[in-house]
Each structure stands twice: as structure tokens, then as C-alpha cells.
Swiss-Prot record:
Reactions it catalyzes: (R)-4'-phosphopantetheine + ATP + H(+) = 3'-dephospho-CoA + diphosphate
Record bears the keyword ATP-binding: yes
PANTHER family listed in its UniProt record: PHOSPHOPANTETHEINE ADENYLYLTRANSFERASE (PTHR21342:SF1)
Alphabetical keyword list: ATP-binding, Coenzyme A biosynthesis, Cytoplasm, Magnesium, Nucleotide-binding, Nucleotidyltransferase, Transferase
Record-stated family: Belongs to the bacterial CoaD family.
Name of the protein in its database record: Phosphopantetheine adenylyltransferase
Gene3D superfamilies registered for this protein in UniProt: HUPs
Entry cofactors: Mg(2+)
Organism of this sequence: Photobacterium profundum (strain SS9)
Subunit structure of this chain's protein: Homohexamer.
Chain positions recorded as ATP binding sites: T10, F11, H18, G89, L90, R91, E99, N124, S125, F126, I127, S128, S129, T130
EC number: 2.7.7.3
Length: 161
């Protein structure tokens, strides 16, 4: 039986922390669907097609990873993707309470959906898309936190008119 999992997020932008979890999930499971949420309420810097394209570009080396944009309920996306395992990252203990609530809600809405938590590697444990965007906005060097293609996209989006 093939194990299909989804790793959902906004990925605005995708960071080395996200990539670390995608690579580790790809090593653990047969097929990983990276679900990029439209998340219009978060007012993302990059639109959904841009986030999908950037994520595809930096995950090309992973043959069992598929990048898909989605909107709506995560459980509906899980059903559409034929996935019954949800991968989530936990950077800190403070993430756990929220993620625990989400896991329970998702299980209530889709009882066959299991949530697996992965912790990032130590060098990625503090990275967040929000912090990366803030540093990039102020022309700080984010190249150690994101792929160079993401650095270029951030600079183009934030500093060219």
C-alpha cells in the first residue's frame, strides 16, 4: 500500500525549515503532497501561483513530492489528495497547543486523518516566513534561511517597482 501524506501550509515564502521537513517527509513516506493554501485572509506577499512555482522549483530534486495549491478546508484537500496522514512541523513548544487543537478538529471532521508532527533540525528551528519577510523588507541578508531563488524573488517583490 502506498502511503500518501499531505504537508500543508501557506509557504509565503517557503523557507529552509519547510524544505527540511519536506525532504524528511519524502524520505519517510511514498508520496508527499505539499498543499499550498491560498490563505487570502493572511494577505500573502506572493500570490498562490507564485508560491506554487517557487516551491516546485526548490523541490524538483524530490521525485515523490507533488506541489498543489488549494483553498477551502484542509480535510477536503486531504480527501481530494487521497491522503490520510497530515504532516505538521513544530518549531517550539508554543506551536504545540495550536497544532494539537487543529489535529483534534481535523480528526473530528475526518476520523481517518492522522497527524504526524516533525520537529525541524536545530539550525532551522527559529525560521519563520514572517521573520524572513521582515528581514528582507529591511534589506537584510536572508540567504541562510531560504533558497537563493527565494532570496531573489523576495528582493524583486519588495525592492523593485
Amino acid at each position: 500500500m502506498t502511503t500518501r501524506v499531505i504537508y500543508p501550509g501557506t509557504f509565503d515564502p517557503i523557507t529552509n525549515g519547510h524544505l527540511d521537513l519536506i525532504e524528511r517527509a519524502a524520505a519517510m513516506f511514498d508520496h508527499v503532497v505539499v498543499g499550498i493554501a491560498a490563505s487570502p485572509s493572511k494577505k500573502p506577499l506572493f500570490d498562490l501561483p507564485e508560491r506554487v512555482a517557487l516551491t516546485q522549483a526548490i523541490t524538483k530534486h524530490l521525485p515523490n513530492v507533488e506541489i498543489v495549491g488549494f483553498s477551502g478546508l484542509l480535510v477536503d484537500f486531504a480527501k481530494e489528495s487521497n491522503a490520510n496522514i497530515l504532516v505538521r512541523g513544530l518549531r517550539a513548544v508554543s506551536d504545540f497547543e495550536y497544532e494539537f487543537q487543529l489535529a483534534n478538529m481535523n480528526r473530528r471532521l475526518m476520523p481517518e486523518l492522522e497527524t504526524v508532527f516533525l520537529t525541524p533540525s536545530e539550525e532551522n528551528s527559529f525560521i519563520s516566513s514572517t521573520i524572513v519577510k521582515e528581514v528582507a523588507l529591511h534589506k537584510g541578508d536572508v540567504s541562510q534561511f531560504v533558497d537563493l531563488r527565494i532570496t531573489g524573488a523576495l528582493n524583486a517583490k519588495l525592492h523593485t517597482k
